[in-house]
Amino acid sequence: MGGFTIIPDCSISDIAVNEKSVLLLPGANTWNDLKHGAIIEKAGELLLAGATVCAICGATVSLANAGLLDHRPHTSNGMGYLEMCSPHYKGQHFYVDTPSVVDDNLITASSTGALLWARQIIERLEVFQPDTLEAWYNYFSSGKEQYFFDLMQTLPSSK
């Protein structure tokens, strides 16, 4: 995908299906390829089990093709994009025209929402304390030096 060689840690059948699992589906224009069917099927199983599934850009098309966006709030690169790339898409009434959307255990984003999507995933996984997350997001969304120092002040001391 994207010209990268990816060596997975496990096979799709080895992915634990429980509420602690997290599946990240990166953006690309190859998601309509049938070879991705197994991971999209697993995404559906994970969503039903309460696991977190995160999809950005072209990966949202595969979720739409599988009907996984038909009945819950979501976003993508535009409703027209989903309609064009997924002829059976029926989630128009749930489409939210914003860069990234969190609906319980589903996090979707347009390609322009990558930073917000990352923030929402980090928040869901509780990687940072809330003040660190806020400073991290402020710094990376603005590039302002003051937020870099704010971020550094929230991190634990390495002493």
Over which residues does each language-model region extend?
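Active-site-adjacent pocket-lining segments in enzyme domains
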Residues: 4-54, 58-159
